């Protein structure tokens, strides 16, 4: 597979962005956040509304995340099982958009046998829906994130990207 080359080539074009093969598309519906999962229905340009998911590969240049990225206590308090939310919103807080390569492969890369039993996906997206709880925890902790995401959505809609 050439997934690393695809990410690296995209990084050379966009050195100040996080490049990810798979993203969750965030949008607003009746004033509430909603998502399209799976990595195939994506925004046509780099945006804060691409919630990166690491399961298919993501490249983080060293200067694109907020200084709070290493605040382990805050991470454990706000979204301990949702590292994708943490990394994504630390990028957004730093003013870093997430781009998806044109040749992205959003298929998850799994190590044989690791998906048996509880997984982060089953913990976060089913049952208690920890994904949405933790997302809201982060918006409550960092209110500027909510404003940034809503303004970005308005910009994307005005630009005809939806």
Regions flagged by a language model, labelled:
Residues 72-162:
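C-terminal catalytic/acceptor-binding lobe
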Residues 2-73:
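Conserved catalytic core of nucleotide-sugar-dependent glycosyltransferases
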């Amino acid at each position: 597979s050439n997934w690393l080359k695809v990410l690296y080539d995209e990084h050379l074009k966009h050195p100040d962005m996080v490049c990810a093969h798979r993203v969750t598309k965030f949008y607003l519906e009746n004033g509430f956040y909603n998502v399209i999962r799976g990595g195939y229905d994506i925004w046509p340009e780099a945006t804060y509304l691409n919630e990166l998911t690491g399961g298919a590969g993501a490249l983080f240049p060293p200067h694109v995340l907020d200084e709070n990225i290493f605040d382990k206590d805050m991470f454990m308090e706000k979204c301990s099982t949702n590292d994708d939310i943490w990394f994504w919103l630390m990028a957004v807080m730093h003013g870093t958009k997430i781009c998806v390569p044109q040749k992205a492969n959003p298929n998850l890369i799994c190590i044989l046998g690791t998906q048996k039993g509880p997984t982060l996906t089953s913990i976060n997206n089913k049952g208690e829906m920890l994904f949405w709880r933790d997302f809201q925890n982060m918006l409550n902790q960092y209110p500027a994130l909510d404003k940034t995401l809503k303004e970005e959505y308005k910009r994307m809609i005005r630009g005809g990207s939806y």
